Each structure stands twice: as C-alpha cells, then as structure tokens.
Amino acid sequence: MQTAEYTNCQEILIEEYNDGFEFNMMTWVMDGEVNVISIADREKTEVEEGMLPISTRNVYPSRFLSEVEKNATDVLQRYIRHTGQMEGALSMQFFWKPDKGIQVCEIAGRFFGYEHELTDMVYGFSIEELLLNYLYEKDKIQTMFAQHDIYAPSKYGAVLYFQGRQLQIADQKAAYQLAQERCVVKPWIFYKEGENVIEYGPNPYLALYYIEADTRGQLEKETRKFFQ
C-alpha cells in the first residue's frame, strides 16, 4: 500500500468511486407514466495514472439496454410517484453492475446537454419537436412515442468529448482534420489557435464530435481514430 496524500486537517471528506458501468437515461413523463427516449453508455478514460477518469464518450444506444431498461424505468416510475410529476422531462444518470443492480447518481427534470442531437441521429426522435408539441400540440406526443422503439435504432451514434489543460492553444490542425472524417455528423471546436484554455469559462470542452455508424462495431473503429 502506498500513501497518496497527507493532511493535518481535523476532518476529511471521503467519497466512494463507483466502478460500475455508467449510463445516461432520458425520458418523458406523460399522464404520470415514464416513457423512455434513450439510454446511453457514459464512458470515461483515465488520462493520468491514479487520477479519476474523465468523461470522453457517450454512446447510443447502450450495449446493456436490455439489462437495465426495465429496472431503470421502474426506479423513475417510483420516483415520480413520490414527487407527483405528471408530465415533462425526466433524466437519470446511474451505475449498474450485474452483481449490484442499479445505483442512482442523479435524477433531474431536464434533458442532458449535448445529447439531444443523438436521439435524432440514432432514432429520428427530435427533442425539439417534442418540446414544441408540449407547448402547442400535446396530442402529437402520444403519437411520437407510439412510433418510437429504443431497441430499433437506424444508426449507432456517439458524442466524443475532448478536454485539455489550462494552456495556450498552439495548433488546431488535428482538430479540424478529425472534423473531416466521414463518420462526423457535427464537429464543435471551441477554441482558436492562440487562445488560452480557461477552466471555468464559456467553453465546456476543447472540442466535441458527433459521429455515427451503421453498427456498434463500426462505431468502435471510428472512435479509435479520434483517440490514437
């Protein structure tokens, strides 16, 4: 055993790290019933030995969809039974391991940022259309979910996140070259050459890329091009 840090503080806060598979789940509550829009794999990468891994890829649909969908939906159904929510957005971030079941990280009445594009790419399910229908034509929401099957994606998709150290951007050629890959649906490069990376600024990442493929296996191959 090796000591990583020392402190002379009288109290310390210890947080357990969950090493289970992580998921992002987006749903819509209609008449007190949870309707699943999507469940994605939320993947992380250890960039420095001994440090907590950072979020680098969310994949739609999850490869564990059939294992987690029913139990995760039941969790949200029980949740709104207590809160009284009858309609609107409801999302959950959770962990799952075969021997431990589901462990909830967060439940919130919102959709996940930078992910509504993926429901459209993968399923043809438009979050924008859902919200507009909620405001103006609620009857159409029922039709949207009647036609939506989370087990029948038309594509496989992912958003790739790139984070960086607080240094000056010297060269963005590689970032723009990656944006030209055929699998890229939408690139989002936040910094220009010469700009300084700010920890708490207007830019959440160095760059992100929405990519798609016909199969999960092909999506894995395309992803490796970005992280070589």
Q: What is each residue range found by the language model?
A:
Residues 1-13:
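N-terminal beta-alpha lobe that positions the nucleotide/phosphoryl donor
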Residues 5-7, 83-85, 179-187:
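Short secondary-structure junctions
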Residues 13-15, 91:
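Short catalytic-loop micro-motif centered on adjacent basic/acidic residues
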Residues 16-22, 26-85, 96, 108-135, ...:
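ATP-dependent carboxylate/phosphate-activation module, predominantly the ATP-grasp catalytic core
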Residues 86-92:
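Active-site-adjacent "lid" and substrate-binding segments of diverse enzymatic cores
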Residues 100-103:
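Conserved protein kinase catalytic/activation segment
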Residues 133-228:
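Peripheral (often C-terminal) accessory segments that flank ATP-dependent C-N-forming ligase machineries
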